[in-house]
Amino acid sequence: MRNWQAPTRRAALFLALLAVTGSALHAEDAMNSTSSHFAYIGTYNPNGEGVYRVRVDPASGALSQVTLVSKVPNPAQLTLGVGGKTLYVASEVADFNGGKHGGITAYRINPADGALTQLNQVDSQGAGPVYLTSMPDGRHLLVANYVSGSVAVFPIEADGSLGAASSVQQQQGPAGAAKPAAAVNGSFAVSDHNGPHAHMIASDPSGKFVFSTDLGLDRIYQWRFDAASGRLTPNDPPWIAASSAGAGPRHFVFHPDGDTVLLVNEEASTLTSYRFDRQKGTLKQLHAVSALPADYQGTSFASGLALSKNGDTLYVANRLHNSIAQFSVGAGGELKPVAETWTRGDYPRSLALSPDGRYLYALNQRSDNVTRFSVNPTDGKLSFVGGYLPIGSPSQMAFLPPPK
């Protein structure tokens, strides 16, 4: 062992500076751990290896510290349970755990670091689950299986795990038109009008009624929901036709006014607004507009929706056109185009607004990145802030509630 010697003045000064710097860095890390929060990103295999946890800086919206937290197969879709204590992940496959369906995995979330603890796994009751969401009271999980065209309901147990399916409905009917009638000139957007393909399922804010879209049948199904039994029963009428032949209804969102539903049609690249009857639980079409610029010609597939908290601004992602189209939402569900923004990536599969609405993220599946935009608080217009997060085939993003 070398004999210890007193440090020189320069060395002592360096050690003191190092101690101060280290303390500052430690303080900054501590501040970041309390002021930042987490989000989860689902991906497609093979570029994406599973579910990733990222740290979100609430001031800048920057994403960092990408960590693989789950390696379940093809976890393209995910959702938080009510309260943000659990995460549910859909494996978009047809052979989950050696079976013939997809699967849903339930996780408990550690709020301190966003780590996941698996609770259980269930068969999704169909092939290729592409959407899942909790009922407003947090007691049931709704799942849409795209490949098989079925929808299912699962009870959520007290610990957040999933029980056996309480209701399974197989959507049936003649396939929709192969070519969308409302598509722009030069569009070759034709896909999957060969049978039922459930693309989304969600309830109204009251939890009394449920709607599911079927891209293959060009229908929007209307269900009544019994909270005691967790069962779906057809409403009257049980479904309504899409706004145009071959439109391919994909995703929808309820407006904060509680009376309006905004829906995106994938194949036609159009948006449709509906009046929601709160008493009957049915929809009536109001308006329909193109999600693409008036002068665009060619193929594009509309995908994800994001609605501002106040309901004034709707954003829709256009794949192949690789844009985010912005619309104002007026009285009576009227939609007017405001602006379009390049996604800075390829094939935006979904959009996500930060919890405070200050940032919007585009999940670009084919360019393997997530891009970040600031949202103008006055007019909702987007500005690219130079943020690229490299991640393989990102599909969907869910934010943990910010720390209180």
Language-model features: locations:
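Blade-level signature of beta-propeller repeat domains, shared across WD40, Kelch, NHL, RCC1
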Residues: 365-371, 383-404
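Short loop/turn segments immediately following beta-strands, especially the blade-tip
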Residues: 54-61, 107-114, 153-164, 223-232, ...
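An edge-strand/N-cap motif at the start of beta-rich repeat modules
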Residues: 31-56
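Blade-loop segments of beta-propeller domains
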Residues: 65-134
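Short glycine/acidic-enriched loop and turn motifs that connect beta-strands
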Residues: 45-48, 92-98, 147-150, 217-219, ...
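A short beta-strand motif characteristic of beta-propeller blades
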Residues: 64-70, 117-122, 185-191, 236-242, ...
